[in-house]
Every structure is written in structure tokens, then in C-alpha cells.
């Protein structure tokens, strides 16, 4: 729309940051929780990387670009000028630009839980079997050795209850070659008489995934993820069931902007929205039409709000392979970044996709329909492959 185009800008951000020499030899990764919509990142005048899409997290490994014991110049170019190959193309919300979510720099041991998997935690928790009497848990961990030597490590997964008391613990011993990234899949972990995650009792365990040096026993890395044990299904005639009980879903959709603030919000405002939903009797949030700040998902987990999360393929598509590929990449980012959220039960990938068709009749319209179907099938297949445990969604009216 004309209003949306008026908000399109090109920004440059610059920051000087002193990096202590004590960090030399460690892995350095910079994370962006959201910047709209095309980013080009430079460090000390050297190009590091780029990212397309304004609503998912991304990160860059900057280890080889840092200067230790001195100042470093971080330069980030961000523009949200209309690009027909990057969704969303058009919608009923404003496409604010710039860096509008948190940015942080993380240092870690060069032998660590992988950071290069679509800015995910590097740990994926699956619950293939859950019922009132028992639950099974599988934990997949991506491991990276960025040293010049092979590494012998011990991988531990510790499941703790909400009070921090250990419930279950598993371990495995792994050898990593220099420069290798390897996947460790835990054996099924059984939890007897689990306390379930539910709308009225959103109980969460926590999973501590640790890497230790096998010989010395020293901690190399640790990642913490939530674990909510629940099972659910949708029935076309009977509705939604959570943990075997029929539940009526009552809720809203939510956009991330506020009057006179745009979408660069403090955490308190995100928290306030979810609290208001809970206080008015809601139990469902459509996180629309794009992945939102991590604090939104954290609050939905904590308060027992069932969620659907979606990528911003809204109203229209562009008939190019680049548009299709960018959409697929967004879907992978979305699923991997929120994979461990117990509140997420639906992944969405299209909204009112034929609302503004570029053609009215004839072969052009038929070709447009066919390409839109191609995008839909690609996104459906991608999400099903990434996470077969949840439902998928396309939203329409009329």
C-alpha cells in the first residue's frame, strides 16, 4: 500500500566495541533477533554476511574478523525497500524497518553446541509418546569442533523439574574431528507419571544440554531448553483436544507494533499483551502474520496459551524461484527456532493468498494459481519434513 511504501527506508548502524584479549581463542557469534528486511553486515570494513527477511532470528560467526585487545567497528546496513522476492509483499500492517529487536554478542568454547543451524538453540526435543502415565523424550544435539585438533567429549542431557530437581539424566561419549559438526541423538528417555503441560497448568520441565571435556571433566558449553509434555489433536467434527480433553480455543491474533512506538518494543509491552489475553479468558494466540519476539513465545509457554506461528506469505506471491526459496528458508527458520516451545501446535505458511490477485482472467491467472500452488506444496513439504508432530495451516476467509 501507499502507506507501507512511505515507511520504506535504508539505515546504517555503526558501533565501536572493545573486545578484550582474553576472548581470543573463543568462538564469537553475533545474534540478531529481528531486523527488517535485508541486512548486510560488516566488521572492521570486511563483509561478513547477509540475511533476507524481517521477522526471524539470524546470526553470524565473527571469530575470524575480530581484533582482540582493541576497538572493533560493527557496521550494519538495513533496508526495507520493497523487494518482490521477499515476503510479505502486501498486508494490512506496516512494514517498519531497521533493527527493532535485541542484538547480542556471544563468546563460547570452540567445541560447542552448534550455532549455525538457522539461529536455533542447536538442540531439538521430541516427545514421540506422551500420556497420563508415562512420556518418552528424544533429544537431538548438533555438536561442532572448531579447533585444529580432534575432540573427545561427553554430552549430557539433564531433565529437571520446575524446582530444579533432577528427574532424568543421560550421557554419551562422542569423538569430533577437527572442523566437524556431528549430530548426537539420545536414547529414549522415559518419564513416569509426568506432570503435563496444559492450559490450566502449563507445567514445564527444563532440559540442560551440556558438553564436557571427556578427560578433564570441564564444562565446555551448556544450552537450556523448555520441555512441555502434552499431546493434542484436531478433529474436524469434535474440535480440539489437549491431553485427551476437549478444549474450546478462544483467542486473538496479534501484531507486534504499538501506537507511537512502531515495533521496537520493550519486553514489558510484549508481556502485557499476553497477560491481557490470559486475563480476559483467552487460551489461544495466532502469532500473526510472522514470528515475533522470543518473549511472546516464552509468555505463551508460561501462561498456557496455545499458539500458531506463521511466516509472512500474505495476500500475494511473486512468480519467481527466488521468492519460493526465500519463503522456504523462512519456514525452516521459524520451525527450528521455536521447535521446543510446548505452546506451539500449528505452523502457518500462507494467509489470504488470493486476496489481491495480479490478474483477473486468462492464462496469466491460471499460471499464477499454479505457481501459488507450487509455493504452497513446497512450504507444506518443508514444514512436514522439519516437524511432522505439529499441524500446518493456511488461513482464508470467504
Report each predicted region and the residues it spans.
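Short glycine/proline/serine/threonine-rich loop/turn segments at secondary-structure transition edges
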Residues: 23-26, 66-71, 150, 190-206
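Short, solvent-exposed loop/linker segments at the N-terminal edge
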Residues: 127-135
Amino acid at each position: 500500500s501507499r502507506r507501507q511504501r512511505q515507511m520504506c527506508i535504508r539505515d546504517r548502524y555503526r558501533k565501536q566495541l572493545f573486545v578484550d584479549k582474553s576472548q581470543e581463542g573463543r568462538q564469537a557469534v553475533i545474534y540478531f533477533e529481528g531486523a527488517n528486511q535485508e541486512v548486510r553486515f560488516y566488521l572492521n570494513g570486511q563483509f561478513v554476511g547477509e540475511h533476507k527477511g524481517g521477522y526471524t532470528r539470524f546470526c553470524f560467526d565473527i571469530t575470524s574478523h575480530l581484533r582482540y585487545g582493541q576497538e572493533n567497528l560493527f557496521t550494519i546496513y538495513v533496508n526495507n525497500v520493497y523487494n518482490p522476492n521477499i515476503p510479505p509483499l502486501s498486508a494490512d500492517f506496516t512494514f517498519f524497518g531497521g533493527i527493532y529487536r535485541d542484538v547480542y554478542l556471544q563468546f563460547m568454547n570452540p567445541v560447542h553446541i552448534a550455532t549455525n543451524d538457522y539461529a536455533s538453540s542447536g538442540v531439538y526435543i521430541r516427545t514421540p509418546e506422551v500420556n497420563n502415565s508415562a512420556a518418552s523424550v528424544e533429544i537431538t544435539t548438533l555438536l561442532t569442533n572448531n579447533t585444529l585438533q580432534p575432540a573427545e567429549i561427553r554430552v549430557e542431557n539433564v531433565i529437571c523439574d520446575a524446582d530444579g530437581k533432577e528427574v532424568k539424566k543421560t550421557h554419551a561419549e562422542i569423538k569430533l574431528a577437527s572442523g566437524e559438526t556431528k549430530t548426537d541423538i539420545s536414547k529414549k528417555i522415559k518419564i513416569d507419571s509426568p506432570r503435563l503441560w496444559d492450559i490450566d497448568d502449563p507445567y514445564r520441565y527444563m532440559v540442560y544440554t551440556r558438553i564436557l571435556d571427556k578427560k578433564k571433566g570441564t564444562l565446555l558449553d551448556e544450552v537450556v531448553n523448555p520441555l512441555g509434555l502434552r499431546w493434542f489433536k484436531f478433529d474436524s467434527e469434535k474440535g480440539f483436544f489437549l491431553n485427551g480433553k476437549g478444549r474450546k480455543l478462544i483467542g486473538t491474533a496479534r501484531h507486534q507494533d504499538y501506537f507511537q512506538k512502531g515495533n521496537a518494543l520493550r519486553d514489558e509491552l510484549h508481556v502485557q499483551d499476553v497477560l491481557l489475553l490470559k486475563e480476559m479468558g483467552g487460551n489461544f494466540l495466532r502469532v500473526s502474520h510472522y514470528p515475533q519476539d522470543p518473549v511472546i513465545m516464552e509468555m505463551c509457554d508460561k501462561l498456557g496459551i496455545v499458539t500458531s506461528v506463521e511466516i509472512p506469505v500474505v495476500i500475494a506471491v511473486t512468480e519467481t524461484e527466488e521468492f519460493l526459496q526465500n519463503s522456504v528458508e523462512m519456514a525452516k527458520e521459524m520451525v527450528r527456532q521455536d521447535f521446543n516451545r510446548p505452546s506451539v501446535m500449528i505452523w502457518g505458511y500462507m494467509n489470504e493468498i488470493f486476496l489481491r490477485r495480479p490478474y483477473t482472467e486468462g492464462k496469466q491467472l491460471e499460471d499464477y494459481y499454479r505457481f501459488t500452488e507450487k509455493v504452497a506444496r513446497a512450504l507444506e513439504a518443508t514444514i512436514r519434513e522439519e516437524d511432522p508432530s505439529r499441524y500446518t495451516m493456511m488461513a482464508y476467509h470467504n
